[in-house]
Amino acid sequence: MPDGSMYPSGNVSTMRLTGYADLFGVNPGKNIKFYVNCNGPSKYNVQIMKMINGDTNPRGPGLIETPIEAACNGNYSGRRQVINSGSYGYVADKPHFHLESFTMQCWIWPTTPKTHPKYWRHGAQGLMGRWSNDKGYGLFINEQGCLEMRINGETLTTGAPIRDHAWHFVAASYDAATGKATLYHEPQIQYALDPTIEPVEKTISKGIVNEANVPFTVACYTATTDGGALAKSSVPSGIVMRGHFNGKIDSPRLCRAALSRQDIETMKMGANRSMTERRNCGPTGDLAKVVVGSWDFSDGINTITGKDKGPYLYDLDIVNCPTRAMTGYNFTGHNFDWKHAQEE
């Protein structure tokens, strides 16, 4: 139990000391481990008790317990322990992700794109990129539920809310030579009264700052890389992810050049070697030269790996087991067993 003096004044409603054992019970002479979380107190006290009556009903005898002498009794130092929830994919930092120019693209099916102060307070959601603390590049859904590109501390947004539970094709490109950033948001289904979402452009003169040790992420963004104590349980260890995307992502692509809209359309086919008679890893010879990653989530559905069909085979390490074998943007409705139509 924690020392009562270590509670903040007037704030005793929160459980500051929690924990669990690795076993439900042991025989005499066996070992049992306890994992303790101290959210506030710096120390806690351990005392083995003999429970005689644990029923606190006022009609009964109440709680009755007596202390038992044990070598483990005493005071221990404690610290806060965290559980890093949320699923995502990442590739550890590689030189190929240190880009000057880029094009990112993917299909998204958001569940809750907009932050609601009373219901859903998730903040911005990361889609893909290599961005952390106003450095790097990334594609996001911002707090207003609109598509947003980030280059260092600069942002570019369409200003058009993303419809939930629907597929959207999104893409972002940046040309370091001209500073031109372009953002595309194209709903798969365009209803009669829907406004047309035009591509938006912005000139960003300062180039991308590529920090070391920042992984490339899908469905989140990197919050910290300081390797602090609270980050040890994160994956990868020492790096904390935030802004987990709530929804489905399909066919993410990354190229190290600012592609035209026509080339972006061609890249939807991914690293399709059959288009060039298997002479390279792109849908065309020119695009094969700039492909960094082309991930295919239909391959290895029963694994915790996101397969990269690009030239470098940068498979995503998938964390916390996101739901897989979901219907994709190209689902025809003819098959309901994913094993018969994995590409859908």
Located regions from the model:
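Proline/serine/threonine-rich low-complexity linkers at boundaries of modular beta-sandwich domains
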Residues: 1-16
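Short, contiguous strand/loop micro-motifs
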Residues: 19-20, 157
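Short beta-strand segments of immunoglobulin-like
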Residues: 21-26
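Extracellular glycan-associated modules
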Residues: 28-33, 38-39, 43, 59-344
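Beta-strand-rich binding/interaction modules
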Residues: 44-50
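Surface-exposed turn/loop modules enriched in turn-prone residues
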Residues: 53-59
